A protein has these predicted regions:
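N-terminal beta1-alpha1-beta2 submodule of the flavodoxin-like/Rossmannoid cofactor-binding fold
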Residues: 1-80, 84-94, 98
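P-loop/Walker A phosphate-binding loop and immediately adjacent motor/lid segment at beta-alpha junctions
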Residues: 23, 27, 95-111, 117
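Glycine-rich phosphate/pyrophosphate-binding loop and the adjoining helix
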Residues: 139-183
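Short, glycine-/small-residue-rich phosphate/pyrophosphate-handling segment
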Residues: 110-149, 161-165
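Mobile beta-alpha loop/short-helix "lid" or hinge segments that flank ligand
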Residues: 41-52, 134-154
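A short helix->loop->beta-strand "cap" motif at the edges of active sites that frequently abuts
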Residues: 36-37, 105-109, 138
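Hydrophobic alpha-helical membrane-association signature
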Residues: 19-23, 125, 170
Length: 183
């Protein structure tokens, strides 16, 4: 089974990418526990920023953008990790999903992971983002992983229980949704 990790984070260090990697690792373990072998492909949206802008302005997709879309289309499941900036996802998130459209995401099991700044996002934001994915005919799992600086601090202190539980629950939901999903 193929899991694509699409991360919309930028900057160094890349906390959104670290969150995505952590989630994908648990998804792979969940799949393995069910007897499935997972292959992972990573799509870093910050590397496609110029390609996404060109597509928005001229309607032309570069080779890199077409390859990213093809990777998502061929996936059995998708982990989407995006930073939350000023109570909304990053622009790369919106741009990439506009390119994908509903044909590519139809029926695709998706796990949404949000990396927040120092403040937690508005309570309804996860619902809004899940709604956007549903509007593209994707099949988002019920649990949304939300992590921020306090979670990174507790991880370094060795007390990551709550975040680990959310990741484990969401990963199990994605693995279960991926098993019957076939192209």
């Amino acid at each position: 089974m193929t899991v694509v990790s699409a991360g919309a984070g930028a900057g160094r260090p890349r906390p959104t990418r670290l969150l995505a990697d952590r989630v994908v690792e648990v998804v792979c373990r969940s799949l393995a526990a069910g007897g499935a072998r997972a292959e992972v492909e990573v799509v870093e949206l910050h590397r496609l920023a110029a390609d996404l802008a060109q597509h928005a302005a001229h309607g032309r997709a570069s080779l890199d953008l077409r390859e990213a879309v093809a990777a998502v289309a061929a996936a059995d499941g998708l982990v989407v990790a995006t930073p939350v900036l000023a109570a909304s996802p990053g622009e790369l998130f919106d741009s990439f999903f506009a390119v994908l459209g509903d044909r590519v995401l139809a029926g695709m099991p998706v796990l949404l992971a949000l990396h927040t700044g120092p403040h937690r996002p508005a309570p309804g934001l996860a619902h809004v983002l899940r709604g956007r994915l549903t509007g593209l005919r994707a099949d988002p799992v019920p649990t949304v992983v939300v992590a921020g600086p306090p979670d990174r601090q507790s991880t370094s202190d060795g007390d990551a229980g709550e975040l680990d539980a959310r990741i484990g629950r969401a990963a199990a939901e994605l693995a279960a949704a991926m098993r019957p999903h076939r192209h």
